[in-house]
């Protein structure tokens, strides 16, 4: 069987720099570059009263999103890419370097399974 895309879900706990719009935006840009995806649009928004940040990159190949809860030290990340030339797992070292989590959980889902 073949899949149309791969979806990597990353749970980050005990993070640093997740209350900064600039840090989240830079992490998204670097993660997109690492996956070899094509950035089409990027939006980053602050959330009050906890200084959380949400950012989403629209990719030619799908999307990458980050949502943060600084009061909990937690960030939720989705990296969904389609196409043989992309590697969503390549975002993981970027996230680790940028946010320095104490704990990280990674789940992978194959999307759009096609029977050959």
Swiss-Prot record:
GO BP: spermidine biosynthetic process
Catalytic site: 62, 67, 82
InterPro entries, per the entry: AdoMetDC_C (IPR042286), AdoMetDC_fam_prok (IPR003826), AdoMetDC_N (IPR042284), S-AdoMet_deCO2ase_core (IPR016067), S-AdoMet_deCOase_pro-enz (IPR017716)
Keyword Chloroplast: no
Sorted UniProt keywords: Autocatalytic cleavage, Decarboxylase, Lyase, Polyamine biosynthesis, Pyruvate, S-adenosyl-L-methionine, Schiff base, Spermidine biosynthesis, Zymogen
Cofactor: pyruvate
A molecular-function term among this protein's GO annotations: adenosylmethionine decarboxylase activity
Modification Pyruvic acid (Ser) occurs at: 62
Site positions (Cleavage (non-hydrolytic)): 61-62
Cofactor: record remark: Binds 1 pyruvoyl group covalently per subunit.
GO cellular component: cytosol
Catalytically driven reaction(s): S-adenosyl-L-methionine + H(+) = S-adenosyl 3-(methylsulfanyl)propylamine + CO2
Domain of life: Bacteria
Pathway: Amine and polyamine biosynthesis; S-adenosylmethioninamine biosynthesis; S-adenosylmethioninamine from S-adenosyl-L-methionine: step 1/1
A Pfam cross-reference name: AdoMet_dc
E.C. no: 4.1.1.50
Mod. after translation: Is synthesized initially as an inactive proenzyme. Formation of the active enzyme involves a self-maturation process in which the active site pyruvoyl group is generated from an internal serine residue via an autocatalytic post-translational modification. Two non-identical subunits are generated from the proenzyme in this reaction, and the pyruvate is formed at the N-terminus of the alpha chain, which is derived from the carboxyl end of the proenzyme.
Role this protein plays: Catalyzes the decarboxylation of S-adenosylmethionine to S-adenosylmethioninamine (dcAdoMet), the propylamine donor required for the synthesis of the polyamines spermine and spermidine from the diamine putrescine.
NCBIfam families recorded: SAM_DCase_Bsu
Assembly and interaction partners: Heterotetramer of two alpha and two beta chains arranged as a dimer of alpha/beta heterodimers.
Family of the protein in this entry: Belongs to the prokaryotic AdoMetDC family. Type 1 subfamily.
Protein's recorded name: S-adenosylmethionine decarboxylase proenzyme
Gene field: speH
């Amino acid at each position: 069987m073949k899949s149309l895309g791969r979806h990597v879900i990353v749970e980050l706990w005990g993070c640093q720099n997740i209350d900064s719009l600039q840090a989240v935006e830079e992490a998204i840009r670097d993660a997109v570059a690492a996956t070899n995806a094509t950035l089409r649009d990027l939006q980053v928004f602050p959330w009050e009263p906890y200084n959380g940040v949400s950012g989403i990159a629209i990719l030619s190949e799908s999307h990458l999103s980050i949502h943060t809860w600084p009061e909990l030290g937690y960030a939720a990340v989705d990296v969904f890419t389609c196409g043989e030339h992309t590697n969503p797992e390549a975002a993981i070292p970027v996230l680790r370097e940028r946010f320095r989590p104490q704990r990280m959980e990674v789940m992978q889902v194959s999307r759009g399974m096609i029977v050959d």
